[in-house]
Amino acid sequence: MERNSLLVCQLLCLVARAAATSTAQTTLPSTVNSTATGVTSDSQQNTTQLPASSAAALSLPSASAVQAHSPSSFSDTYPTATALCGTLVVVGIVLCLSLASTVRSKELPSDHEPLEAWEQGSDVEAPPLPEKSPCPEHVPEIRVEIPRYV
């Protein structure tokens, strides 16, 4: 079980690292040039003052700028959402595998449990079947015996 939890931690760290890397790669400063007024505005410089005519030019991006910066896939558009979805998928797979190993370990005897105790079965015994069926006389009786494999 310790091995499974170590694998879970390693997978989660790997996914978190990939998410941080993809987010860092897509966070770039955007620079807008207005050739009509000769004013350059950088997103990192907040002290740039723009005249009213260039503010209107900056608010409407040209078609070439939109095409040049448009992402081509969902992972380019939403890197954080992609990383979170990947994390959820990995966590779901790990949970399913750990649940399956837990169920499997309960079905088989453990190494520490003596095999004789497993073969003897539990202390709860099935009640004996009644000799006479509680069904009325005109209803046919179907009796099924289920063998118990030990």
Curated annotation (Swiss-Prot):
Which compartment or compartments is the protein found in?
Host membrane
Write down the InterPro entries for this protein, in alphabetical order: Cytomega_UL124
| Any single GO CC term annotated in Swiss-Prot or TrEMBL for this entry | membrane
Q: Where is this region: Disordered?
A: 27-54, 108-138
In the UniProt record, the signal sequence range is 1-20
The membrane spanning regions, by residue number, are 83-103
Composition bias (Polar residues) maps to 32-49
Give the way it sits in the membrane.
Single-pass membrane protein
Identify one Pfam family in the record. HCMV_UL124
Keywords for the protein's UniProt record, in alphabetical order: Host membrane, Membrane, Signal, Transmembrane, Transmembrane helix
Q: What family is this protein classified in? A: Belongs to the HHV-5 UL124 protein family.
- What is the name of this protein? Uncharacterized protein UL124
The species this protein was found in: Human cytomegalovirus (strain Merlin)
The record lists the lineage as: Viruses, Duplodnaviria, Heunggongvirae, Peploviricota, Herviviricetes
Q: Which gene is the coding source of this polypeptide chain?
A: UL124
